[in-house]
């Protein structure tokens, strides 16, 4: 057996983990300051979790792609391509892409029914009370724990393999930078770092693709790769593939992976509050487009990286440059995620190892930041605000969010160390997740899509489903392999059985329990009872001249409520500052701008928003059906049944299509967000120039003249509109 020796020194691992972590943390701290100074983005409790509910399409799409690029997206897809052939990588990508597009339906429904929500668990609590809330709290937290532990175990393993870095150290050090920038910038920092990480990953994937298929001295063309992979099939044919070929989509193991992936990833998308955070943070106009674009853009990443590095590993395994030459990778080495770095090292030397390491670092940290926000928002709004201090101020809630981020980061580092010592791999957690959590998928969907499902069905069906799934998984393992070990429970058929039972069994339980215990006939209007956090005290503390009541209307009730949230010293500061003013300062301008539109205008805007969401929902249903057929039926099934072995021309065409698709992804999530945000980028850079050149007065003049362009104004107008529309009674018409 060839030994895989670390191609890079330990210092490289620590430099990337600590150095890049510090760089990103510093960049986000600086960015948070710049946005506060030039765009008036003030990090309140609401802003920390929802980013003002106004994030545009491109940035949300980039964040969706980044959150869905796990280590397994890069490593497992390449491993499956290496083990099962060309269908392996496609099965991974198609099995995990559809859920993102389908989630657009839930994103739109959340915007329609509960525009003030912070987590999907708030919707569950509103509908089913504390019992239902407690049940789904378990599934939400379990999802975050499983996803984060998989990220840390896989990331630390790769750093150890490529640099010799201590695995325990990497488990604890990888989250440090992520926690720091998440604490300072909240979900907006997550969006921005997700964007940067996505750009880096896509660039590296394109570098690998052009190196393998165009410029490499070892390979250099699709035809050369094709010939070498066909030769590899003669040396070690694939069990379960037609004629043992890698260049066929008739693959039993890859077909099983497609089903397991499809089932398991419904849970990791629909039950992970991180995706709901992004949906809630998106502007209403972005809800559909962001998830549709994000899903399609993401598909190209695992498809092309596996098509490139999985097949390249097969093609170069007889090259003297291969890390384990003259032996190929063992199954243990391949399953440990070494396919991608082995191919990169063989083709690009140490540069390939560095690129692999950088890509894995980006995948771990970007996905983990989303998990931190997901857990902190659940802990803050579904535990602390609900059960500990229902009248907590925004300041207390943001402090709670910070504590939750730190605690979860530390806890997951410790848990990942335990998994490492227990010998549990990334692949094992990835395939096992669906067994644990997927029974809650259908009940969550029906919580938003059906009036009839009652409390008993909502609570009992996922619990029964999880129990039956675990039992089926273990019974199948015992009956087929006569013993229960990590290796036997990781086999294809037990994993397939457990995942199928988990996802599908609630489809039997829910109708029965709903019929026996009577349909609920839920009133969707109750979803409007979910409220936003009052940001008054936090905004006044940031700028004492901001007043969040309509002074012109002299609304005494609102003014008294606002004043009750502001300390006497802050009131005195406001009075003293106002006495000094000759002209209205920025705080007063902001206050006036927030109340510039009357209630009728706001209601008309909300009506149009609801109509736009209703149109988007119809399109989302169509896209869901279309892409389900395209990705899961129309392309793979005929190719599987025909037993077609790719010709050289067909394979070349497939490579070209995937490269073009990734260029589309690059445009959608790297260039388009810059275009959408060009005005904000320009005004921020211009304000920075004015400050650095001693012309700060111009910044003040611009902000006073254009309050409608300031984030605090747009977010507070939205908050005011939805606060005053709690009586809006058209929800039943749009569901």
Curated annotation (Swiss-Prot):
It is found in: Membrane. One of its GO terms (cellular component) is cell periphery. Induction: By allophanate or its non-metabolized analog oxalurate. Sensitive to nitrogen catabolite repression. Residues 36-85, 152-166, 211-253, 317-343, 425, 476-496, 640-650 are extracellular. It is a multi-pass membrane protein. Gene3D superfamilies: Sodium/glucose cotransporter. The chain crosses the membrane at residues 15-35, 86-106, 131-151, 167-187, 190-210, 254-274, 296-316, 344-364, 404-424, 426-446, 455-475, 497-517, 619-639, 651-671. Residues 553-572 are annotated as: Disordered. Residues 1-14, 107-130, 188-189, 275-295, 365-403, 447-454, 518-618, 672-735 are cytoplasmic. The keyword Transport applies. GO terms for molecular function: putrescine transmembrane transporter activity; spermidine transmembrane transporter activity; urea transmembrane transporter activity. One of its GO terms (biological process) is putrescine transport. May polymerize. Belongs to the sodium:solute symporter (SSF) (TC 2.A.21) family. Required for active transport of urea. This is Urea active transporter. It comes from Saccharomyces cerevisiae (strain ATCC 204508 / S288c) (Baker's yeast).
């Amino acid at each position: 057996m060839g030994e895989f020796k670390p191609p890079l020194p330990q210092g490289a691992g620590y430099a990337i983990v600590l150095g890049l972590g510090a760089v990103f943390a510093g960049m986000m701290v600086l960015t948070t300051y710049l946005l506060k100074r030039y765009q008036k983005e003030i990090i309140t409790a609401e802003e920390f979790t929802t980013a003002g509910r106004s994030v545009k399409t491109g940035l949300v799409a980039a964040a969706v792609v980044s959150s869905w690029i796990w280590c397994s997206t890069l490593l497992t897809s390449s491993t499956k391509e290496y083990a099962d052939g060309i269908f392996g990588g496609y099965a991974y990508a198609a099995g995990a892409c559809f859920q993102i597009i389908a989630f657009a339906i839930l994103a739109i429904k959340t915007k329609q029914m509960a525009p003030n929500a912070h987590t999907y668990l708030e919707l569950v609590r509103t509908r089913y009370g504390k019992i239902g809330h407690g049940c789904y709290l378990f599934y939400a937290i379990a999802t975050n724990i499983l996803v984060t532990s998989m990220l840390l175990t896989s990331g630390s393993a790769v750093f150890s393999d490529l640099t010799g870095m201590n695995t325990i150290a990497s488990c604890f050090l990888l989250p440090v930078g992520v926690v720091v920038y998440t604490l300072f910038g909240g979900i907006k920092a997550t969006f921005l770092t997700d964007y940067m990480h996505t750009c880096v990953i896509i660039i590296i994937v394109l570098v690998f693709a052009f190196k393998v298929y165009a410029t490499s001295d070892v390979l250099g063309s699709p035809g050369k790769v094709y010939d070498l992979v066909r030769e590899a099939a003669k040396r070690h044919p694939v069990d379960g593939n037609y004629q043992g070929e890698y260049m066929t989509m008739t693959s039993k193991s890859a077909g099983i992976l497609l089903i397991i992936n499809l089932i398991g990833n419904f849970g990791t998308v629909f039950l992970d509050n991180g995706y709901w955070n992004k949906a809630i943070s998106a502007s209403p106009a972005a809800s559909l487009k962001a998830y549709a674009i994000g899903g399609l853009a993401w598909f190209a990443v695992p498809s092309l990286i596996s098509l490139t590095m999985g097949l390249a590993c097969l093609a170069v395994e007889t090259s003297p440059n291969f890390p384990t030459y003259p032996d190929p990778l063992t199954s243990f080495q391949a399953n440990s995620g070494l396919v991608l770095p082995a191919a990169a090292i063989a083709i690009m030397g140490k540069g390939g190892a560095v690129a692999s390491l950088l890509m894995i670092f980006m995948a771990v940290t970007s996905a983990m930041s989303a998990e931190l926000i997901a857990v902190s928002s659940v802990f803050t709004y579904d535990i602390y605000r609900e059960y500990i201090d229902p009248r907590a101020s925004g300041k207390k809630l943001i402090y709670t969010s910070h504590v939750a981020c730190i605690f979860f980061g530390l806890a997951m580092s410790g848990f990942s160390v335990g998994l490492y010592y227990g010998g549990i791999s990334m692949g094992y957690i990835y395939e096992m997740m669906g067994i644990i959590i997927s029974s809650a998928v259908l009940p969550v969907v029906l919580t938003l899509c059906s009036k009839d499902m009652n409390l008993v069905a909502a609570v009992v069906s996922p619990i029964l489903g999880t129990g039956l799934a675990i039992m089926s998984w273990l019974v199948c393992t015992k009956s087929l392999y006569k013993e229960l070990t990590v290796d036997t429970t990781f086999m294809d058929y037990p994993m397939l059985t457990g995942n199928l039972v988990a996802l599908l069994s609630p489809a039997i339980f829910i109708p029965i329990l709903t019929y026996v215990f009577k349909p609920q006939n839920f009133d969707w209007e109750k979803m409007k009872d979910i409220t936003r956090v009052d940001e008054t005290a936090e905004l006044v503390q940031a700028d004492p001249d901001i007043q969040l009541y309509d002074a012109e209307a002299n609304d005494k009730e609102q003014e008294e409520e606002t004043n009750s949230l502001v300390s006497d010293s802050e009131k005195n500061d406001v009075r003293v500052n106002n006495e000094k003013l000759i002209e209205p300062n920025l705080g007063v301008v902001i206050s006036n701008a927030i109340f510039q539109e009357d209630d009728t205008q706001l209601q008309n805007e909300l009506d149009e928003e609801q109509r736009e969401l209703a149109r988007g929902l119809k399109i989302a249903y169509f896209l869901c059906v279309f892409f389900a057929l395209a990705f899961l039926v129309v392309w793979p099934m005929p190719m599987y049944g025909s037993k077609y072995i790719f010709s050289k021309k067909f394979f070349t065409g497939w490579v070209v299509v995937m490269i073009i698709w990734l260029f589309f992804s690059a445009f959608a999530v790297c260039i388009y967000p810059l275009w959408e945000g060009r005005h904000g980028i320009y005004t921020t850079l211009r304000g920075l120039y004015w400050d650095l050149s001693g012309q700060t007065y111009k910044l003040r003049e611009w902000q006073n003249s254009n309050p409608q362009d300031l984030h605090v104004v747009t977010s507070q107008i939205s908050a005011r509109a939805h606060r005053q529309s709690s009586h809006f009674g058209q929800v039943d018409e749009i569901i």
